[in-house]
Every structure is written in C-alpha cells, then in structure tokens.
C-alpha cells in the first residue's frame, strides 16, 4: 500500500469520527455502520490493542439497536450531551477546554484560529452545520482533509496543537455525563487514533527537519 493510500485510509477514519460527532445516528446511518463492510472495518480496527475496548463498545451498542425506541434513546444521548448545553452535557468545542476563563465564549479565540485554518485551505463550515469552527466534528473533518492534501509536518502540527491539547479533558467530562458509554467510547477511540498518528508522524517529520 502506497503512502497516498495509507493517508486516504486514515482520512476515512477521521471522516467517520467526524460524522459521529456531527449528528445523531439515524436509521440510514445505523444501516451503514452495521453493514457487512462496516463489521469488517470494526473487526480490523479492534485488532489494535489501544482501540479494542472502545471499538467493542461502539460495535455492541450499534449492533444492539433492534427497534426505533433504542435508536431514539441513542439520539437522545447525542442531544443531551452535545446540543443542550447544561451541566450534564459535554459540549464538543475546543474553546471550552482551552480557555482560562470561567465562562468561555463560543466563537472565541479557538473558533477564530480554526476559521483561519479553514480559510487558508479554501474551506468553510457548511451552512447546514451552524456550529463554531472549533467543534470537534469540524476539526476532525479538517484533519481528514490534511491527510489528503498536506505534508506530514502540517498534519503533525495540527494534531499536536489542536487536538492533543484538549481531547483528554473533553473525554473526562464526557465520561461523567455519558451513562450509556457509546459517545465516551467514540471520543476515547478518537484520542487513541490521534495519539497513534502523532507517534507515527513524529519520526517521519524528524528525518526531514
């Protein structure tokens, strides 16, 4: 497999993770995530020890949804965690975990920084997703873009500065709020994936720096 193929494969994982944070799982998405091809993907991903526990939780939750009521319960989890904005939620915005302010504002410094990254790449947050640019789903989608369109050093810098600096705090808060455990598993898998990419990119960047 060429490096281009590897980068595209990794980009697909970031796109998947982005989609899970961008919107709730509906009936069509559930079919995609539990299809034969998806089962093979989850099985392959679970072979990596750092991913196994998270992937097993994601798979068991998705495969266990057998009726509309169970699907609605998962959708309610998404809404309660990411859309409501109460003490029982875990808003997926970098600014809430990086700002030193007691009550950080949305559309603040991290949003502006992420908007500039998007602008430099001639991208923008789509109108059907009216969220600040430092929403985790946006950042993951941008990371997928970088894996297909940028050098290793750019990928590494973005992972280190824009993900590694706050994801652990987000996961700690999310775990306290997410009783079902599905989205905690998705977030934990995201951090493990980011850390693996950083570990793989650092030696490659060091060789040419």
Curated annotation (Swiss-Prot):
* GO biological process terms on file: protein complex oligomerization; protein folding
**Keyword Chaperone, does the record have it?**
yes
Would you indicate the residue range of the signal peptide?
Answer: none
- Show the InterPro entries listed in the entry: Chaperone_TorD, DMSO/NO3_reduct_chaperone, HscB_C_sf, TorD-like_sf, TorD/DmsD_chaperones
Give its localization. Answer: Cytoplasm
Task: Report the principal subcellular site.
Answer: cytoplasm
One matching Pfam family is Nitrate_red_del
PANTHER family registered for this protein in UniProt: CHAPERONE PROTEIN TORD, CHAPERONE PROTEIN YCDY
Q: What is this protein called?
A: Chaperone protein TorD
Gene name for this UniProt entry: torD
